[in-house]
Amino acid sequence: MPRAYLVRKLKLVIFCCIVFILLYGGNILRQAIRDRKCSEEESKFLMDELCHNYSTHAAAGNMCPALCTFKKLKYNKCTNYRGGKKVLIAQCDGVCKEGSTVKAVIKSKHPKEEFRFEPLDLEKHANGSLTQMGYKMAHNIFKSLLDSQMLEERDKISDIFSFLWSLDVEQYKRENRDFKSAEMTAMQNIWGLINQDEYLFMKVHQKQSFVPKMYGTCGFYYVMEYAPPGDILDPQFFSGSGSSFEERAKIAIDILDIVQSLDYGFYEPVHMCDVKAENFGIGEDQQVKILDSDSLFFHTSMMKNLAQPSCTNHDDCDFFDCRGWCELETGKCTKQRSNNNLQTVCEDILIDKPTNFYAGLLHNPPSEFKEELLPLLEECAFPAHSKGIVRKPTSDDVYWKLHNLLKRIIRES
């Protein structure tokens, strides 16, 4: 055997080993960063501080008694920080789900230096209670935030304060009539909650099947349904999820349904700007849920984020996974988004590529469907044979072809 051939083969083996080590090491680093634990001591302190605020009437909400008085909502552990947000896992005994003990998630961006919002400065009487003008000011401020989330049904809401909170404000005032500033406490608590984008979106859109259940609030903290990604949406390196293609196809269909809802189910499109599989989870009803709605933006809000003073290339008009288009003649980002949620989901979740270690959600399809499915996924992720950063939209026709094909695969499996 020629020496040159052996040298080439040895170099190939060494190259493959280096690639393997880099991929494996990168995955370990990614897991370490993503799963870095918050401080247990700090988390317990935050819960103690919250209960202290409840005892002094600075915090209120329907979950405060369960957390602080009856101990029906018990802190279990903390998990990783996401964008400055505290995410704590708790055990909920008969409060979140009547007659059952379930896991729940306690979330808040407070207290965090990055979590800043304008103080709620309302006109008050000398004893701390709101004047009629102060009450009207709060109503108008809260209504403007509510308008950013819903336009079609806002006029049907008779009590904005109670709609945005976990308690009936008037009842809370009656039950705390000896506490003159009870109304102001309610307003401050609501204000601290609705300044958190995730809370506002999920509270307002609880009727959507892909939104985790909102169990309630205490102070600036909100308690939600526990819906972990599981091994299918967040598989471990090498071991994978061990799931069948049929199981993964069902989840893919749920995600496609969410895409359709975000594109067409609201008064204007809602854009996903941080698309990755672990940002979805499986709820108690076995439906796929969106876990991180901080990265969801209504189209009007999205265009404000893309509104640069000027742009010289398309990258200037990007906002994370939401990609814009620069009109070079005017130097302005266009008001029409150049790609949609469907394209991003196909590229970042469904197909195989190096960043997911060639294990997209729809990897290894049944052999009899490969020739039909793989080109369709390619067309979905890279419309019109796009290369690099994709800025072309994926057509609705591709959506329906993919949706119907996955249903057929499940039916015939």
Where do the PLM segments sit?
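Protein kinase-like catalytic core scaffold
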Residues: A104, F210, Y222, K289-D292
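Amphipathic alpha-helical interaction motifs in eukaryotic regulatory proteins
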Residues: Q196, L200-Q206, Y215, L256-D263, ...
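Catalytic-loop of the protein kinase fold
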Residues: V259-D292, F297
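ATP-binding glycine-rich phosphate-binding loop
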Residues: L23-N176, G192-Y199, H205-S209
